[in-house]
C-alpha cells in the first residue's frame, strides 16, 4: 500500500497526459512465484555459487526479475491503451540510467521494432553451449533488462521463449536473473530482437544510436 500511494502521488497529477492503470496484486499470489519458489530454493542447496553469505541474488530476486515478461504479457492482454508498443522500466532506474528525462520521451515517440534491448557483454554460442559452465560463478553479464521496449506482436513469442529458457535452467538446478535468461533467449531466437550496444549507463542514450 505504501508503494502504490507513493506512485499515485507522482502519476495521478499527470493523468491528462499520462493516464495510468494500476494492477495491485502481491507477487506471491501469482502461480509463477508460488510454484517456482520452492523449486529454486531446493536447487540452490546443491549449487555453491548461490550459498555465499551476503549475496544479493536470492530466490525472490530471480523470480521478481523474470516476472517482467509475464507483466508485459498481462499488459498486452489487457491492452488498456490500445497500443502497438510497450516498455519495461525498472523502478528506481535513475541510479544507473543517464538522461532519463531527455531520452525516455524520444524512445516513446519512436520505438524500435521487435524486442529492443541493450546487449552489454556479448556471449558467443561457445560460451553459452553448456549452462553449468556458464553459471559456475553466478550470473555473468550479457543483455541488460533494466529497460527494453516490446512491439505488441512479438510479446507472446518473447514470453514463451523466456519461459522455455527459465524452465530449462530450473530443470538443471541453475538460474540467476532475467538478464541471463534474456541472453540465452537472444542466442536461440535472434529474430525476436532489435539489439543495440552499450553499458548500463547508456541503455537509454544508445537506444537510437550509439553515443558512448
Annotate the PLM regions.
Residues 12-23, 112-113, 187-196:
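Structural alpha-beta junctions
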Residues 115-131:
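Short beta-strand-to-loop element that shapes/binds the nucleotide-sugar donor at the catalytic cleft/hinge
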Residues 95-99, 117, 137-212:
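Catalytic core and acceptor-binding pocket of nucleotide-sugar-dependent glycosyltransferases
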Amino acid at each position: 500500500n505504501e508503494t502504490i500511494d507513493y506512485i499515485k502521488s507522482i502519476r495521478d497529477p499527470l493523468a491528462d497526459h499520462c493516464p495510468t492503470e494500476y494492477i495491485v496484486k502481491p507477487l506471491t499470489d501469482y502461480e509463477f512465484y508460488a510454484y517456482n519458489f520452492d523449486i529454486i530454493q531446493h536447487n540452490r542447496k546443491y549449487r555453491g555459487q548461490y550459498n555465499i553469505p551476503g549475496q544479493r541474488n536470492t530466490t525472490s530476486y530471480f523470480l521478481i526479475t523474470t516476472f517482467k515478461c509475464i507483466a508485459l504479457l498481462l499488459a498486452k492482454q489487457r491492452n488498456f491503451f490500445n497500443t502497438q508498443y510497450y516498455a519495461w522500466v525498472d523502478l528506481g532506474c535513475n541510479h544507473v540510467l543517464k538522461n532519463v528525462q531527455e531520452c525516455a520521451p524520444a524512445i516513446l515517440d519512436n520505438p524500435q521494432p521487435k524486442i529492443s534491448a541493450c546487449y552489454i557483454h556479448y556471449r558467443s554460442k561457445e560460451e553459452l553451449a553448456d549452462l553449468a559452465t556458464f553459471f559456475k560463478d553466478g550470473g555473468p553479464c550479457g543483455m541488460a533488462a533494466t529497460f527494453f521496449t516490446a512491439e505488441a506482436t512479438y510479446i507472446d513469442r518473447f514470453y514463451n521463449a523466456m519461459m522455455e529458457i527459465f524452465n530449462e535452467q530450473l530443470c538443471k538446478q541453475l538460474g540467476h536473473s532475467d538478464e541471463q535468461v534474456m541472453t540465452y533467449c537472444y542466442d536461440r531466437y535472434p529474430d525476436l530482437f532489435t539489439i543495440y550496444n552499450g553499458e548500463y549507463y547508456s541503455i537509454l542514450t544508445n537506444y537510437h544510436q550509439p553515443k558512448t
